Amino acid sequence: MTQLHIAARSVELSALTKRFGRTTAVDGIDLALDGGVVGLLGPNGAGKTTLLRMLATVLAPDAGSLRLLGLDPARPDERLELRRRLGYLPQAPALYGSFTALELVDYVAVLKEHTDRDRRAQECTRVLDLVGLGDRRNSRIRALSGGMRQRVALAAALLGSPDLLVLDEPATGLDPEQRLELRSLLADTATRGTVVLSTHNTAEVAALCQRVVVVTAGSVRFEGTPAELRGLAEGRVWESPIADPRATRSWMTADGAFRNLGDLPAGVAPSPATLDDGYFLAVRSGR
Ligand SMILES: Nc1ncnc2c1ncn2[C@@H]1O[C@H](COP(=O)(O)OP(=O)(O)OP(=O)(O)O)[C@@H](O)[C@H]1O
């Protein structure tokens, strides 16, 4: 008889919940992700960082369960293995200013138990080269620009080619060229594992993500491909010289015309929808 192997998903969340006092930051999220780059979109305070911190095992849920790479982070033995196979870039990484870029990355490598000294040195050099900081490896963190510091933290997250890479607004502070580099770096990582990132930039999602999850008030409002998110707004967008009062939302565009979102009025021709339009609709559906 053929043995049926069902591979563990990279991320499996069931009724995942996290509260801070009276605030429910993550409110019973069910989600299964496996492979590729997944973009997490949502307004300020939606719960993205809280969710990512739980995926990175730095925060434990109050209720519900999560399995990451088939492992249970609540179990100390499984958590250790998981942390070796996980990379995390926090939202505002606190870096020791007096360390050099190399010392900082090496320190994280030690914490991740890369015990072989020579291999650790090679790995640190590799990840610093990957983020384009090979020539600044001996610069002190405090002497680096904001974007370079972000790249040092990214290098630390890439140590050991993680199977699950969790990135909180990774493009913050990067210039356009560095953003392009980041995209190819993450696309490459996603060929071997799963990348989950938060962003406020729908263009980033369109360029990089195979899947997108829209979160508001701690709940998932949409999960699907970027094309499906855009599709939500297809036939629900139109332009006009002044804001149309029939729209649920209107805003002025760069050319001075108004873009309207809502039920298309009779006799009005729809405009092609964008990912932003789909995002606005997904966010509003939760209100
Ligand atoms: N450590 C904490 N203590 C108390 N409240 C918190 C804490 N962390 C988050 N919160 C609250 O939980 C909610 C979700 O916050 P979170 O940082 O996860 O949102 P976010 O989607 O990442 O926001 P942003 O886009 O602004 O980064 C917010 O209401 C926030 O104030």
Predicted regions and their residues:
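ABC transporter nucleotide-binding domain
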Residues: 180-260
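Conserved ABC ATPase "signature" region
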Residues: 106, 110, 118-136
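Conserved structural motif at the start of ABC-family nucleotide-binding domains
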Residues: 11, 25-28, 83
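Catalytic Walker B motif of ABC-type/P-loop ATPase nucleotide-binding domains
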Residues: 165-169, 174
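Conserved ABC transporter NBD signature motif
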Residues: 64-75, 81-82
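Walker A (P-loop) phosphate-binding loop of ABC-type ATPase nucleotide-binding domains
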Residues: 43-47
